[in-house]
Amino acid sequence: MIDYKLFKKIEKYAQLHSQSSIDHYRKRNQNTDKILINCIAGKIGEFECYYSMINAGYKIKSPPDLAIYPDDDKSHAADMICVGKNDILYENEKHIHIKTVSFNTFKNYGISFLIEANDRLVKYPKDNHFYSVMIEESLTSYRFGKWICSTDVIWMPPKMNLPSKLACYL
Protein backbone atom coordinates (compact mmCIF):
# COMPACT_ATOMS: atom_id res chain seq x y z
CA MET A 1 0.00 0.00 0.00
CA ILE A 2 1.20 3.50 -0.79
CA ASP A 3 1.90 5.70 2.24
CA TYR A 4 1.15 9.43 2.43
CA LYS A 5 4.74 10.54 1.79
CA LEU A 6 5.03 8.46 -1.39
CA PHE A 7 1.55 9.55 -2.52
CA LYS A 8 2.61 13.22 -2.28
CA LYS A 9 5.73 12.46 -4.38
CA ILE A 10 3.55 10.71 -6.96
CA GLU A 11 1.09 13.60 -6.97
CA LYS A 12 3.92 16.11 -7.58
CA TYR A 13 5.35 13.88 -10.33
CA ALA A 14 1.91 13.66 -11.99
CA GLN A 15 1.46 17.44 -11.95
CA LEU A 16 4.86 18.03 -13.54
CA HIS A 17 4.47 15.16 -16.01
CA SER A 18 1.01 16.26 -17.17
CA GLN A 19 2.23 19.86 -17.63
CA SER A 20 5.29 18.74 -19.60
CA SER A 21 3.23 16.39 -21.80
CA ILE A 22 0.05 18.40 -22.41
CA ASP A 23 0.66 18.77 -26.17
CA HIS A 24 1.33 15.04 -26.50
CA TYR A 25 -1.97 14.19 -24.79
CA ARG A 26 -3.92 16.72 -26.87
CA LYS A 27 -2.59 15.14 -30.08
CA ARG A 28 -4.05 11.84 -28.87
CA ASN A 29 -7.41 13.57 -28.18
CA GLN A 30 -7.22 12.75 -24.49
CA ASN A 31 -9.35 14.62 -21.99
CA THR A 32 -6.92 17.00 -20.29
CA ASP A 33 -8.97 16.87 -17.07
CA LYS A 34 -8.30 13.13 -16.76
CA ILE A 35 -4.57 13.28 -17.50
CA LEU A 36 -3.54 14.09 -13.92
CA ILE A 37 -5.79 11.38 -12.43
CA ASN A 38 -4.58 8.78 -14.94
CA CYS A 39 -0.96 9.74 -14.31
CA ILE A 40 -1.38 9.34 -10.54
CA ALA A 41 -3.19 6.02 -10.99
CA GLY A 42 -0.52 4.71 -13.35
CA LYS A 43 2.34 5.56 -11.03
CA ILE A 44 0.54 4.10 -7.99
CA GLY A 45 -0.01 0.91 -10.01
CA GLU A 46 3.70 0.81 -10.85
CA PHE A 47 4.71 1.11 -7.19
CA GLU A 48 2.11 -1.49 -6.12
CA CYS A 49 3.44 -3.93 -8.75
CA TYR A 50 7.01 -3.19 -7.66
CA TYR A 51 6.28 -3.83 -3.96
CA SER A 52 4.27 -6.98 -4.78
CA MET A 53 7.14 -8.38 -6.81
CA ILE A 54 9.78 -7.50 -4.20
CA ASN A 55 7.62 -9.14 -1.49
CA ALA A 56 7.32 -12.28 -3.66
CA GLY A 57 11.11 -12.55 -3.92
CA TYR A 58 11.67 -11.06 -7.37
CA LYS A 59 14.78 -8.99 -8.05
CA ILE A 60 13.90 -5.68 -9.73
CA LYS A 61 16.59 -3.48 -11.28
CA SER A 62 15.20 -0.24 -9.81
CA PRO A 63 12.02 1.19 -8.29
CA PRO A 64 9.55 3.09 -10.49
CA ASP A 65 10.95 6.27 -11.99
CA LEU A 66 9.68 9.67 -10.82
CA ALA A 67 11.87 11.71 -13.19
CA ILE A 68 10.34 14.12 -15.71
CA TYR A 69 11.83 13.86 -19.18
CA PRO A 70 11.67 16.38 -22.04
CA ASP A 71 9.32 15.45 -24.91
CA ASP A 72 12.19 14.39 -27.16
CA ASP A 73 13.57 12.06 -24.46
CA LYS A 74 10.39 10.20 -23.50
CA SER A 75 10.66 6.48 -24.16
CA HIS A 76 8.41 3.50 -24.46
CA ALA A 77 10.73 1.38 -22.36
CA ALA A 78 9.36 -1.06 -19.81
CA ASP A 79 8.22 0.31 -16.46
CA MET A 80 10.29 -2.28 -14.63
CA ILE A 81 12.98 -4.83 -15.35
CA CYS A 82 13.01 -8.10 -13.42
CA VAL A 83 16.44 -9.72 -13.27
CA GLY A 84 15.64 -12.80 -11.18
CA LYS A 85 13.81 -14.40 -8.28
CA ASN A 86 15.26 -15.27 -4.89
CA ASP A 87 18.81 -16.52 -5.56
CA ILE A 88 18.29 -17.21 -9.27
CA LEU A 89 19.27 -14.62 -11.87
CA TYR A 90 17.51 -14.79 -15.23
CA GLU A 91 19.61 -15.26 -18.33
CA ASN A 92 17.16 -13.00 -20.16
CA GLU A 93 15.77 -10.04 -18.16
CA LYS A 94 11.97 -9.70 -18.05
CA HIS A 95 10.70 -6.29 -19.17
CA ILE A 96 7.42 -5.42 -17.48
CA HIS A 97 4.95 -2.91 -18.88
CA ILE A 98 2.43 -2.04 -16.17
CA LYS A 99 -1.17 -1.25 -17.08
CA THR A 100 -3.52 0.10 -14.44
CA VAL A 101 -7.26 -0.49 -14.67
CA SER A 102 -9.84 1.50 -12.72
CA PHE A 103 -12.39 -0.44 -10.72
CA ASN A 104 -15.20 0.80 -13.02
CA THR A 105 -13.33 -0.35 -16.12
CA PHE A 106 -12.70 -3.71 -14.47
CA LYS A 107 -16.42 -3.99 -13.61
CA ASN A 108 -17.45 -3.17 -17.19
CA TYR A 109 -14.76 -4.96 -19.22
CA GLY A 110 -13.01 -7.41 -16.90
CA ILE A 111 -9.23 -7.65 -16.81
CA SER A 112 -8.28 -5.63 -19.85
CA PHE A 113 -6.12 -2.75 -21.00
CA LEU A 114 -5.69 -0.36 -23.90
CA ILE A 115 -2.57 0.51 -25.84
CA GLU A 116 -1.76 2.86 -28.71
CA ALA A 117 -2.25 0.97 -31.99
CA ASN A 118 1.17 2.12 -33.22
CA ASP A 119 3.04 0.90 -30.11
CA ARG A 120 6.23 -1.00 -30.99
CA LEU A 121 5.25 -4.09 -28.98
CA VAL A 122 2.08 -4.45 -31.06
CA LYS A 123 4.11 -4.81 -34.25
CA TYR A 124 7.18 -6.45 -32.72
CA PRO A 125 6.24 -8.46 -29.62
CA LYS A 126 9.11 -10.03 -27.68
CA ASP A 127 9.14 -13.13 -25.50
CA ASN A 128 10.85 -11.29 -22.64
CA HIS A 129 8.33 -8.41 -22.53
CA PHE A 130 5.25 -8.80 -20.32
CA TYR A 131 2.19 -6.76 -19.44
CA SER A 132 1.16 -6.68 -15.80
CA VAL A 133 -2.42 -5.55 -15.22
CA MET A 134 -3.01 -3.84 -11.87
CA ILE A 135 -6.63 -3.34 -10.74
CA GLU A 136 -7.70 -0.39 -8.61
CA GLU A 137 -9.07 -1.22 -5.16
CA SER A 138 -8.93 2.31 -3.73
CA LEU A 139 -7.23 5.60 -4.52
CA THR A 140 -3.88 4.38 -3.23
CA SER A 141 -4.22 0.62 -3.57
CA TYR A 142 -4.04 -1.65 -6.61
CA ARG A 143 -3.96 -5.42 -6.74
CA PHE A 144 -2.32 -7.69 -9.26
CA GLY A 145 -4.77 -8.78 -11.95
CA LYS A 146 -2.90 -10.84 -14.51
CA TRP A 147 0.35 -11.22 -16.49
CA ILE A 148 0.59 -11.82 -20.20
CA CYS A 149 3.61 -12.11 -22.48
CA SER A 150 3.59 -9.63 -25.37
CA THR A 151 3.84 -12.55 -27.83
CA ASP A 152 0.59 -14.06 -26.44
CA VAL A 153 -1.60 -10.95 -26.67
CA ILE A 154 -4.54 -11.07 -29.06
CA TRP A 155 -5.25 -7.43 -29.90
CA MET A 156 -8.82 -6.38 -30.63
CA PRO A 157 -10.64 -3.14 -31.36
CA PRO A 158 -11.78 -1.55 -28.08
CA LYS A 159 -15.43 -1.91 -27.09
CA MET A 160 -15.50 1.90 -26.86
CA ASN A 161 -14.98 4.13 -29.90
CA LEU A 162 -11.23 4.76 -29.62
CA PRO A 163 -9.80 4.48 -33.15
CA SER A 164 -6.13 5.05 -32.19
CA LYS A 165 -6.19 2.27 -29.55
CA LEU A 166 -6.15 -1.50 -29.38
CA ALA A 167 -7.49 -3.55 -26.49
CA CYS A 168 -6.47 -6.74 -24.76
CA TYR A 169 -9.28 -8.56 -22.93
CA LEU A 170 -7.93 -11.27 -20.65
Model-derived features with residue positions:
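Nucleic-acid endonuclease domains
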Residues: M1-A77, I81-L170
